[in-house]
């Protein structure tokens, strides 16, 4: 459902590469010439392009997930020079960063050795500058790079080294992901004067390097490919290179000014796993909500023995004013209805529009099909309901109004379709498509950025079109230009160059939105690309960062627009060691399970975990994250009935797709 990446490591020929470590004298001379010429730009003279978390602090989510600071922004405690007991005077703490700014500063290492870990840091390199991040460093050699593999750090514009920032020196480099349409080697670095975020994972499950949120490459320490690349590099002269199994983290002095901050590390278990990032566990179990339910017109297996397309239920909802009935939407294009009774036997077809809906099980169509259903607040009077689906062939997203049949309110009328909106989609993924009515009576529509990797059309921040946004429209009125009106208090009404339908923007792939019936808060889970999954509280006019930010962190090197500095951070985020594809849920308002009351339930499709999040109005971050299910349940969506009971849905070849929670 939610697209992920796959990658194969790549390297380059080293026959003509000028080695980095033997050119230090030239580097120092070059740096000195820059200083004399007045061309040096301090790495601390930052051009602020994006909203930033306070430096050298952990978010609550990071703390719960096991991250720790290696630098607190005020002291150099925990660091020393290579083969020394203390830190030289060439390294200073300046404005919350540890800065190499003096002569003979020397390479510095952590006091502690690390085996398996994830490391994240921000660096700011001077014009033409060069540095590096090494791992598994031992003190058996004259220089740390003779034992510890190095992730290159340099100014890619004016730097002299052919090994670019983020490359594993003379070993691995990024490569274009051709399946995503990339044709050039990616360079996600930002220029001197701006902070870059470097991420490194060293794990028995596989290692990875990312630059500003973009995965560069993956590798395995010590495998045949690794050994082959070592033999082709200068490191073959050092028998212990990259083979210590553990060692110090090292920041390199290459004779140029460089600054580091937000140096964070999380140690991994021997198998590469992490502890569950939760504040506690709820004593709950799950069960089929309607164990006897059969779907009209659908059987698990055809008469010839062929398995049918599994049930993929993306919406379970109710019509306001009718607590006795549920409406369930299948991604294939069929909506069913049945009594809200655990002993119910049959789900009857409410409407079948498969003839106009693209197939989600077709090649590339996993995030297409019938994606959204919302019953009009006055459905019991006017019989109106709304859907979002993707069209076959053109792959456009369609928002339509339907009505029930005149003589049967339990049957939708396929011929009653009134198209409100058609939105072109450049790719087949990140369609979004969740729709909800707010307490204000307006229809809210969530669209992703249009798909592929890295938001190639910059739709997340491009408000002249509708992708990457949550829209808000009045479906009870029409205008001369459309079959709906724009609410007068929409945030961008009358603003030149911005579509007035936009309520909030900066989303990558909002996989389900939901209103809290008690507070009116709009919750949105946004599926991340390579590092972070988000839970957001959506505010009118808010910019949620994509694609200049992912979660609360920098992404890529695209310049942000005028409002990027005010982007809103998620109230909760988790990294890809926890899960890789968030499924947004709903706030539990039933009285049946007191321990869930008022908590936002969400899941991860890849890890199969389910959690309950506690949050208070006005808080920047969620107060508590509790485990409901440890893993193994690939939840595709959540639903809610008139009583505030929350259900969750998984794919099922047997048709048993709807589940609920229960006390143990």
Predicted regions and their residues:
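Conserved blade-ending motifs and adjacent loop-strand segments that build the rim/top face
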Residues: 507, 620-642
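Carbohydrate-interacting regions of secretory-pathway proteins
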Residues: 49-273
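Short, conserved, GDST-rich strand-edge loop motifs in beta-rich repeat architectures
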Residues: 446-466, 532-534
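Acidic, Gly/Ser/Thr-rich repeat motifs that build Ca2+-stabilized beta-propeller blades
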Residues: 118, 130-136, 271-454, 512-515, ...
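Short edge-strand/loop segments of extracellular domains
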Residues: 135-158, 214-218, 331-335, 342, ...
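Beta-propeller blade signature
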Residues: 399-407, 459-475, 538-539
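N-terminal secretory signal peptides that target proteins for export/translocation
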Residues: 1-25
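Bacterial N-terminal signal peptides
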Residues: 30-43
